[in-house]
Amino acid sequence: MKRIKNFSFVFLITSFLFLILDFIIGERFLKKIGLIYIEELIRVSNDQYEYSFEKNLNVDYAVWGDQYYKLCTDNRGFKFNCFDEEKKTYEIAIIGDSFTEGIGLPFEKTFVGMLKSKKNLDLVNLGVASYSPHIYLKKIKYLISKKIIKFNHIIVAVDLSDLEDDW
């Protein structure tokens, strides 16, 4: 009976340690080789305007639902196409929620990316999923006051769900 208890104890401890090591090492390994990029690493909190994208991302496997997509951000955390040079001044800034961000899509397939390439417009995408009018205002004020970015025009892409996000 004592052998069974000892075996059970050793088995439980070994299983527990294996699961912990598998979780820690496995997740780190997958992140390192770019096969997993969880939302907590992509979307980060921001003291000035709630949250934003992590800066300087270039990942092939950002996840939205069951889809993987390429995501690149610049040194300010703005979604962009990975190839453009970062600029300080733009003709038009577009801010909004998931539709503006183009969640689940690489930059080139978002409406901002298509306007930029097809119409040759000088645009920057400030959109992030679940943003609301309150966050739009905070982000725009912060970016302007700290001289992080300049733009001549802003398009605020508001949708009906944005109002709920502020409650």
Please describe what each predicted stretch is.
Residues N6-I24:
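Hydrophobic membrane-insertion alpha-helices, especially the h-region
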Residues F29-K118:
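Membrane/wall-proximal cationic-aromatic binding patches
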Residues L21, G96, V158:
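Active-site flanking residues adjacent to catalytic metal/cofactor-binding acidic residues
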Residues M1-K5:
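Positively charged n-region of N-terminal signal peptides that target proteins for export
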Residues I13, K87-K88, K119, K150:
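Residue-level preference for short coil/turn positions at secondary-structure junctions
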Residues E91-I95, V124, I154-V156:
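Conserved beta-strand elements of the Class I
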Residues G26-K55, P133-W167:
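Interaction-surface signature
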Residues K116, L121-K138, I144-S145:
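A conserved hydrophobic secondary-structure block that centers on an alpha-helix together
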